[in-house]
Amino acid sequence: MPASPSRPAIARIWRGRTTRARADEYEAYYNEAGIKPLIEKAMGVQSLREDRADETEFMTISYWESIEAMSRFTGGDPTKIHHLERDKEFLIELPAAVQILKLRHSHGNTGSK
């Protein structure tokens, strides 16, 4: 799928886990400190949450027109993670990498809020 200004070509996926007891607090912090700035740079952003028995996993998918656009956001290496100031306080472990995928097909309503 060729990249165009209206269609993203790349998805960047970040995952992080916190304890269930701190999940709501982390989500509020992460939305303010992580998601809001990302919305200003990426073509689109999705934030997902899965509550498990003892922990909660957060996943953020950001959509980009190209690897180059993502590289401008990260300052060079598109796989580089920008840990937030309080991530060490909340997360069970700091993620070591992000996943970068080429977007091939997107159909229907993929969600927005």
Residue spans for each PLM region:
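Intrinsically disordered, low-complexity acidic/polar segments
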Residues: 23-25, 69-71, 107-109
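Glycine-rich beta-strand-turn "strand-cap" elements at beta-sheet edges
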Residues: 1-10, 43-59, 82-113
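Short amphipathic alpha-helical segments
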Residues: 18-47, 78-86
